[in-house]
């Protein structure tokens, strides 16, 4: 019987919290705590439905600095950046200096055909009868 009363009381407390949550506005009251927030920290710790506050946990640093996010030197070491840079420079130089192959000739032919289909210069404005195929 006692467990039934406890479960009913817990359900009533949850319902009251839900009503408080639904009725509160988006802006907190000007002073003090919100009426929807429990005043007792022990009650807040016991409720498993409430989210864990990061700012109040032991995981939060006392004072945040850039070093927490980017690391102490705030730059990548040269021995990590240099190989990637040299590889990209070598690729660009190779693409520029290599001899043309059959694939390059085919690609140039395909691209030039597309250029020939598009007229150069501004498109001519068509009059309304010519636009619809009427003879003038």
From Swiss-Prot:
Superkingdom: Eukaryota
Entry keyword annotation includes Electron transport: yes
The keyword Transmembrane helix is assigned to this record: yes
Annotated keywords: Electron transport, Membrane, Mitochondrion, Mitochondrion inner membrane, Respiratory chain, Signal, Transmembrane, Transmembrane helix, Transport
Biased composition (Acidic residues): 112-127
Signal peptide residues on this chain, from the entry's feature table: 1-15
Major location category of this protein: mitochondrion
Pfam families (alphabetical): CCSMST1
Protein name: Ubiquinol-cytochrome c reductase complex assembly factor 4
Species of origin: Mus musculus (Mouse)
Gene name in the database record: Uqcc4
